[in-house]
């Protein structure tokens, strides 16, 4: 059976020899991967640089702070 270039590209893109490898570590070693906290704290929010107000037509109006300061939300 002859493989064309398109067949070779299809096979190389759809099947990976690393996709379904068995984990050879014992269960006690694998279990240690999932111990401990499973979350991180959220990052601090950046302060807003402009204030957005909406007019009666539904269009936004952007107001910039004076002297490069930050606007409190």
Swiss-Prot record:
Record's subcellular location: Secreted
Annotated region (Disordered), positions in chain: 25-48
Keyword Signal among record annotations: yes
Assigned keywords, A-Z: Antibiotic, Antimicrobial, Cytolysis, Fungicide, Hemolysis, Secreted, Signal
Signal sequence region: 1-14
BP GO terms, sorted: defense response to bacterium; defense response to fungus; killing of cells of another organism
GO cellular component, one term: extracellular region
Function: Displays antimicrobial activity against the Gram-positive bacterium S.aureus ATCC 2592, the Gram-negative bacteria E.coli ATCC 25922 and P.aeruginosa ATCC 27853, and the fungus C.albicans ATCC 2002. Displays stronger activity against P.aeruginosa and S.aureus than E.coli. Displays very weak hemolytic activity.
Designated name of the protein: Antimicrobial peptide lumbricin-PG
Organism: Metaphire guillelmi (Earthworm)
């Amino acid at each position: 059976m002859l493989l064309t270039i398109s067949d070779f590209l299809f096979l190389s893109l759809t099947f990976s020899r690393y996709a379904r490898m068995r984990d050879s570590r014992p269960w006690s070693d694998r279990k240690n991967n999932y111990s401990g906290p499973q979350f991180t704290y959220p990052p601090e929010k950046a302060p807003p640089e402009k204030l957005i107000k909406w007019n009666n037509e539904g269009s936004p109006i952007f107001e910039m702070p004076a002297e490069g300061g930050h606007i409190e939300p």
